[in-house]
């Protein structure tokens, strides 16, 4: 075993890449470390392409093992289960920048498996996983146009920070991950605290500059440790067939792509493609249908792109910077705590907001530690939204990714727990889709939160942008359609307020996109965002003053922390009785904060009264209505407050001399008593005599 090792300093950490010792039967395996966080990345590709396949089957599996953090998994089986939301998001983060680096026409199955085997809770495994994946693909011999570099960028006190750790990110106004090759940025994923466009773009450029050290180190590792390159050549296009397809379909496709209604357009495109295929098969029954489909797809792409570059109107007749017609409604459902319906052209989201207590917050136990998530956003994409039938079940990777992007867009404006002590769950149901449903979810969420009375700092809107570039000519498109998304060269989604960006996601498919092009695109996105915000603010301009009648109202009060055990009672008996008898939910915190949640105001008042009784201090000189609980020879014990008894001595029962206590009092009798003294041991001395109203003294002669 001869390990080949490369180490370099990156930000405040040392990165080490090692190959040649572990997993030697894979096409490539790299053990990558950043500090104490270590991942094993393996790459395996099938040498033979499966006949009839018309897509590139790349699978990225990212798995966090609990042993990496020195933990044993919970649950009955005590082993790792299906991927968590965080694992799914990191798998997508790795997949997005490596996919465009495989050549067109490469259809062999490739599987990348990233296993987190050791973790430092201060160093998130995502960046080192991406570096390790880039290194493993670079030395695998697969036709991979890398290496790929990656950097996380923070922004604190006006300065960019390279690869901030978990603690530094808490105070950072930016969490941006940028991946790219030596000459081009390929992917950006970020959330920010309403930062200006130039700061966001500066972060992208800074991250791309800094990651060159990663690319250089992987290039050195490749020179020493690479497997022989695969003997793969791109399939050669049949130029005669290309010309025939152009003659048969170009004019028809050009006309079809001027039909503005999506389903009608799809029908007409289908008719033209079918006619072309029939003509070609009639001429040559042996023709390869898969090749014909591929060439028709390429022609379709070329037709749309050339129209856009030539300055013609877009597929649906719009100019490049136009946003589709908007229809915005808040409060559309009667019993939900907040709701909205946001429609932009043929994209529509029905969004609901539900308020809950602290107990409803999501508790996450990951290898990075335990944390609580008070704000949840779930995105659903049913098949009917695109006029199809399909499987309905647990969320797929794409739905989890889109939900997280919308969450990032909104999170920066959410109130703190002190300002708004509720857990919030938002669900976005995509009811129609033709481009950028995730950004429709951002707009719909902002509206639904305001409708629910959540005091968000300001409205947030999102917009999806596209770019078509041919040579030096380029056109930036605002509010792209689904068709423009898959045949453009860049798609990026921007969410934000009037003041700045809260989330930015970019996926770039070509080299040569300069900082200037990105700057123009971001400025155009700003104009579109403000236009959408103006329309949204007409529907609901600020959060409702009061929450829904159907939502639980949370009332907060403070008690002496030493009294918490009195409220809980022996074995939780007191608090259990309180919640059951009043129908409220009661939460206690160590600092003496008590949160009472109920949608019934009277029930809340009753719970407050009873808690105040339990926690009240006995005051000397105060008269209480008490209840006799025990009679003894020398007096009677009287309960004056829940859990607080005092003694009325026999001499303090009446003005006259009392021989037998039972002649005056019985158990269960209610009496007025005055507190005379509370001694050092907390014993309470009471008097009925002093509490009785005094008879008027006779008037002087």
Swiss-Prot record:
* UniProt GO molecular function: 3'-5'-RNA exonuclease activity; magnesium ion binding; polyribonucleotide nucleotidyltransferase activity; RNA binding
**Key word Repeat present:** no
Look up the record and name the cofactor or cofactors this protein needs: Mg(2+)
Top-level class of the enzyme under EC nomenclature: transferase
Quote the record's binding site residues for Mg(2+). Answer: 485, 491
Q: Which reaction does it catalyse?
A: RNA(n+1) + phosphate = RNA(n) + a ribonucleoside 5'-diphosphate
- Report the SMART domains cross-referenced here: KH, S1
Could you list this entry's UniProt keywords, alphabetically sorted: Cytoplasm, Magnesium, Metal-binding, Nucleotidyltransferase, RNA-binding, Transferase
- Kindly give the SUPFAM superfamilies that the UniProt entry links to this protein: Eukaryotic type KH-domain (KH-domain type I), Nucleic acid-binding proteins, Polynucleotide phosphorylase/guanosine pentaphosphate synthase (PNPase/GPSI), domain 3, Ribonuclease PH domain 2-like, Ribosomal protein S5 domain 2-like
Q: Does the keyword Lyase apply?
A: no
Gene3D superfamilies membership: GHMP Kinase, N-terminal domain, K Homology domain, type 1, Nucleic acid-binding proteins
Provide the transmembrane region boundaries.
Answer: none
Q: Which InterPro entries match?
A: ExoRNase_PH_dom1 (IPR001247), ExoRNase_PH_dom2 (IPR015847), ExoRNase_PH_dom2_sf (IPR036345), KH_dom (IPR004087), KH_dom_type_1 (IPR004088), KH_dom_type_1_sf (IPR036612), NA-bd_OB-fold (IPR012340), PNPase (IPR012162)
Q: Gene Ontology cellular component?
A: cytosol
Q: What is its EC number?
A: 2.7.7.8
List the subcellular locations. Answer: Cytoplasm
Annotated KH domain residues: 552-611
Main role? Involved in mRNA degradation. Catalyzes the phosphorolysis of single-stranded polyribonucleotides processively in the 3'- to 5'-direction.
Enumerate the HAMAP family for this protein: PNPase
NCBIfam families, from UniProt?
polynuc_phos, PRK11824.1
Protein family (similarity comment)? Belongs to the polyribonucleotide nucleotidyltransferase family.
Q: What is this protein called?
A: Polyribonucleotide nucleotidyltransferase
Q: Which organism is it from?
A: Shewanella piezotolerans (strain WP3 / JCM 13877)
């Amino acid at each position: 075993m001869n390990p080949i090792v490369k180490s370099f300093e990156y930000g405040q950490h040392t990165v080490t890449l090692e190959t040649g010792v572990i997993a030697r039967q894979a096409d490539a395996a790299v053990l990558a470390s950043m500090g104490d966080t270590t991942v094993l990345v393996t790459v395996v590709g099938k040498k033979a392409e499966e006949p009839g396949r018309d897509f590139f089957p790349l699978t990225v599996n990212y798995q966090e093992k609990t042993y990496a953090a020195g933990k044993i998994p919970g649950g009955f089986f005590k082993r790792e289960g299906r991927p968590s939301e965080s694992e799914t998001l990191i798998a997508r983060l790795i997949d997005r920048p490596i996919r465009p680096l495989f050549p067109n026409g490469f259809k062999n199955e490739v599987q990348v498996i990233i296993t987190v085997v050791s973790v430092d809770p201060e160093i998130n495994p995502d960046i080192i996983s991406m570096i390790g994946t880039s290194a493993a693909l670079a030395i695998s011999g697969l036709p991979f146009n890398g290496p790929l570099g990656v950097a996380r960028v923070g922004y604190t006190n006006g300065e960019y920070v390279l690869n901030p750790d978990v603690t530094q990110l808490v105070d950072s106004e930016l969490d941006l991950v940028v991946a790219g090759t030596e000459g081009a940025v390929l992917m950006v994923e970020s959330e920010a605290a309403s930062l200006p466009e130039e700061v966001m773009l500066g972060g992208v450029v800074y991250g791309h500059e800094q990651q060159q050290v990663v690319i250089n180190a992987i290039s050195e590792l490749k020179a020493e440790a690479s497997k022989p390159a695969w003997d793969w050549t791109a399939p050669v296009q049949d130029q005669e067939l290309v010309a025939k397809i152009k003659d048969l379909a170009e004019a028809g496709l050009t006309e079809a792509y001027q039909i503005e209604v999506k389903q009608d357009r799809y029908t007409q495109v289908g008719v033209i493609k079918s006619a072309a295929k029939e003509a070609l098969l009639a001429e040559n029954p042996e023709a390869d249908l898969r090749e014909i489909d591929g060439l028709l797809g390429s022609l379709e792409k070329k037709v749309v792109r050339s129209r856009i570059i030539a300055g013609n109107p877009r597929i649906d007749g719009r100019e490049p910077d136009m946003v589709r017609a908007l229809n915005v409604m808040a409060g559309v459902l009667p019993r939900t705590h907040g709701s909205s319906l946001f429609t932009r052209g043929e994209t529509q989201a029905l969004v609901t907001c539900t308020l809950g207590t602290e107990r409803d917050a999501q508790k996450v136990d990951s290898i990075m530690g335990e944390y609580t998530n008070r704000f949840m956003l779930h995105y659903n994409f049913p098949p009917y939204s695109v006029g199809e039938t399909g499987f309905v079940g647990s969320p797929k990777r794409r739905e989890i990714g889109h939900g997280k992007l919308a969450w990032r867009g909104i999170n920066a404006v959410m109130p703190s727990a002190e300002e708004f002590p509720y857990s919030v769950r938002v669900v976005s149901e995509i009811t129609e889709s033709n481009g950028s449903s995730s950004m429709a979810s951002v707009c719909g969420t902002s509206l639904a939160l305001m409708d629910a009375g959540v005091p968000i700092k300001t409205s947030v809107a999102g917009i999806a942008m596209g770019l078509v570039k041919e040579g030096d000519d380029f056109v930036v498109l605002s509010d792209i359609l689904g068709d423009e998304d898959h045949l453009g060269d860049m798609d990026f989604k921007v969410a934000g307020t009037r003041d700045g960006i809260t989330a930015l996601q970019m996926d770039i498919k070509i080299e040569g996109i300069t900082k200037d092009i990105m700057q123009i695109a971001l400025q155009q996105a700003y104009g579109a965002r403000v236009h959408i915000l103006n329309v949204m603010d007409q529907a609901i301009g600020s959060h409702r003053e009061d929450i829904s009648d159907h939502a639980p109202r949370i009332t907060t009060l403070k008690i002496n922390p030493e009294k918490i055990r009195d409220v809980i009672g022996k074995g939780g008996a007191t608090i259990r009785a309180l919640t059951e008898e009043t129908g409220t939910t009661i939460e206690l915190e160590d600092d003496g904060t008590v949160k009472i949640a109920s949608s019934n105001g009277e029930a809340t008042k009753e719970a407050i009264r009873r808690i105040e009784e339990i926690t009240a201090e006995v005051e000397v000189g105060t008269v209480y209505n008490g209840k006799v609980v025990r009679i003894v020879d020398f007096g009677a014990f009287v309960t004056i407050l829940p859990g607080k008894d005092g003694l009325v001595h026999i001499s303090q029962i009446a003005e006259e001399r009392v021989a037998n206590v039972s002649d005056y009092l019985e158990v269960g009798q209610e009496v007025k008593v005055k507190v005379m003294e509370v001694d050092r041991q907390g014993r309470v001395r009471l008097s009925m005599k002093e509490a009785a109203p005094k008879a008027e003294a006779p008037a002087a002669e």
